[in-house]
Amino acid sequence: MSLQTVLVVDDERDIRELLTITLGRMDLQVDAVGTVAEARRALGERSYDLCFTDMRLPDGTGHEVIELIADEHPDTPVAMITAYGNVDAAVSALKAGRCMSVKHRS
C-alpha cells in the first residue's frame, strides 16, 4: 500500500518543517514548497490526497493554489492556514473550492 501524500505550500520554512514532521509521524508522505509556482509544478507532477496552503505567498495567494487544485484535482481537500485570517478570507476560500481555513499564530 502506498503512503497518502500531502502538499504543503507555505513561504515560512519553519511552518513547512513543522507540518512535514507532524504529518510524517502520521505516516503521510509530504512534499513542501514555498511558492505558488512551486505548487503548480508539484501539482503537475502528481496528485495529492490533501493540501495545506498559506494564504499569503511571495508570488501570489493561497486562493490561486485552491483554484489550481479545484480545476486539476477537484477531489483533493485543501486547508488554508494563515496568520492573517478573517471571516471574509475564510468565506472566499470556501467558495473557491473544497477548503477549510485555519488561523495560526504568527
Residues of each region from the PLM?
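Short amphipathic alpha-helix used as the core "switch/output" element in two-component signaling
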Residues: 41, 63-75, 92
